[in-house]
């Protein structure tokens, strides 16, 4: 047992009673996560063809044993048409129904990105379906890429972490990744894994988000590689095209990158620190 106390002009430390208590070993929480790279290969604007493609993608990942399946961003965006006319009602739209039916068929958790129509507004959303095909979570992208603003898409107004039997799941979409606060707040909310559907992304930024917050990042992309990045920044699995499944043990407390913390690896921000020590920005301001 070590105590580091450094760089304080004045202060005291008292040691109280320290003891070791026997505890049961933490049971493994193994989860197979499936990610996907690439969209419909043809330039077809036939909605039926697109629906079938994504249903087949889920079938492929499920056949590899995936418990949690992630598809890319805006899978119902077909060609250069009007985004309002292509948007799905959630629940009830055709692409949503494919996600729901596939989740129920394979008894898997499925997350997919959709243009979502809610009354007079359109959002860039990600739907999380449970193994019964029910809507378990809905996240609306908060940081829009500038063309989306011109297309009339409305930003979401909050971040969420969803409780599942697999663990706590956070979601960020595409351009959200450019703001460190998004993944920081998801980690502070207890996320075991963050799902990152996108149309394209900067790999260096994605790796930094996993390292920054000591969490797993699952990536599915229309125009980039699919991968799962671990808290050290290494790829668990990766593919340039199609699907791949990675096995994660979410019972293991993620460790920071080995370079974090220097001689204070046992201190907050060091190797043994977890995302549970992170506070939302509001908390930091309140304490200032």
Residue positions per predicted region:
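Generic short beta-strand
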Residues: 1-3, 126-127, 226-227
């Amino acid at each position: 047992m070590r105590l580091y106390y450094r760089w304080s002009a004045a202060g005291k430390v008292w040691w109280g009673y320290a003891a070791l208590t026997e505890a049961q070993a933490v049971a493994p929480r193994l989860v197979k996560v499936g990610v996907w790279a690439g969209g419909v290969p043809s330039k077809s604007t036939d909605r039926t063809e697109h629906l079938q493609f994504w249903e087949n993608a889920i079938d492929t990942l499920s056949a590899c044993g995936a418990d949690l399946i992630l598809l890319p961003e805006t899978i119902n965006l077909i060609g250069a048409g009007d985004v309002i006319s292509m948007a799905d009602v959630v629940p009830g739209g055709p692409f949503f129904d494919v996600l729901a039916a596939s989740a129920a068929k394979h008894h898997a958790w499925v997350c997919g990105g959709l243009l979502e129509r809610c009354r007079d507004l359109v959002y860039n959303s990600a739907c999380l379906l449970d193994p019964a095909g029910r809507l378990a979570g809905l996240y609306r992208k908060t940081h829009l890429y500038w063309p989306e603003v011109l297309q009339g898409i409305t930003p979401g107004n909050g971040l969420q972490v969803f409780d599942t039997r697999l663990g706590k799941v956070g979601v960020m979409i595409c351009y959200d990744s450019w703001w460190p606060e998004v993944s920081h707040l998801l980690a502070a909310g207890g996320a075991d894994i963050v799902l990152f559907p996108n149309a394209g992304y900067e790999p260096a930024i994605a790796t930094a988000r996993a390292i920054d917050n000591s969490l797993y990042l699952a990536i599915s992309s229309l125009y980039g590689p699919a991968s799962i990045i671990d808290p050290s920044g290494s790829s668990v699995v990766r593919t340039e095209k199609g699907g791949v499944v990675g096995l994660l043990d979410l019972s293991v407390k993620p460790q920071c990158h080995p370079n974090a913390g220097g001689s204070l690896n046992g201190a907050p921000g060091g190797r043994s620190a977890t995302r549970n020590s992170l506070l939302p920005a509001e908390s930091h301001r309140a304490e200032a």
